């Protein structure tokens, strides 16, 4: 079994009435990063994902160079490099009439492995969510899978929970 094919243990569901500084709805790459950064900055985070991992999602399957500094900072870049992937060295634009233009990415970024990667979304999302689960739970927060948020609860304009 590959590293992205097994279930991710997110622990138990927090008790009713639990309090959190931040609630992040959605455990894709952006939600996982938001939950991780908030937890690393001392917030007690609740990360909620409607699916149960592993899951797949249609995507272009690329991680751009500008996001790699965050991927590295969160401890996921090494995980990516240990799985099947391609390093991106250029971008090809194509038109309906078959013409193409290839734009090479900066050589120094490619040499530093910071130009970008191409890998299945399932792999990348899995690694981001798994790492977010580790960071959030180590900081005292909670992660829930298989929960679909139907309503954001507010009290005089302040978010007080979800259901």
Regions found by a protein language model. Name each.
Residues 1-22, 37-41:
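Extreme N-terminal leader/targeting segments of oxidoreductases
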Residues 17-19, 92-163:
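Conserved N-terminal helical subregion
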Residues 23, 39-59:
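Glycine-rich FAD pyrophosphate-binding loop
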Residues 26-28:
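Glycine-rich Rossmann-fold phosphate-binding loop(s) that bind the pyrophosphate
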Residues 31-32:
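N-terminal Rossmann-fold NAD(P) dinucleotide-binding loop
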Residues 36, 40, 69, 130, ...:
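Short, well-ordered alpha-helices that flank and scaffold nucleotide-derived cofactor binding pockets
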Residues 42, 75, 136:
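Short glycine-rich hinge loops at helix-strand junctions in the catalytic core
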Residues 57-97:
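N-terminal FAD cofactor-binding segment of flavoenzymes
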């Amino acid at each position: 079994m590959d590293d992205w094919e097994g279930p991710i243990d997110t622990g138990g569901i927090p008790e009713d009435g639990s309090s959190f500084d931040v609630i992040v709805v959605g455990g894709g790459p952006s939600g996982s990063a938001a939950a991780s950064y908030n937890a690393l900055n001392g917030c007690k985070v609740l990360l909620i994902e409607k699916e149960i991992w592993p899951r797949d999602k249609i995507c272009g399957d690329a991680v751009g160079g500008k996001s790699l500094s965050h991927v590295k900072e969160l401890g996921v870049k090494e995980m990516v490099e240990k799985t099947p992937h391609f390093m991106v060295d250029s971008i090809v634009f194509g038109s309906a009439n078959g013409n193409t233009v290839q734009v090479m990415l900066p050589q120094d970024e490619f040499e530093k492995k910071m130009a970008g990667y191409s890998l299945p979304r399932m792999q990348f999302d899995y690694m981001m969510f798994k790492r977010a689960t580790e960071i959030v739970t180590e900081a005292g927060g909670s992660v829930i899978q298989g929960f679909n948020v139907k309503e954001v609860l507010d009290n005089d304009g302040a978010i007080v929970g979800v259901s």
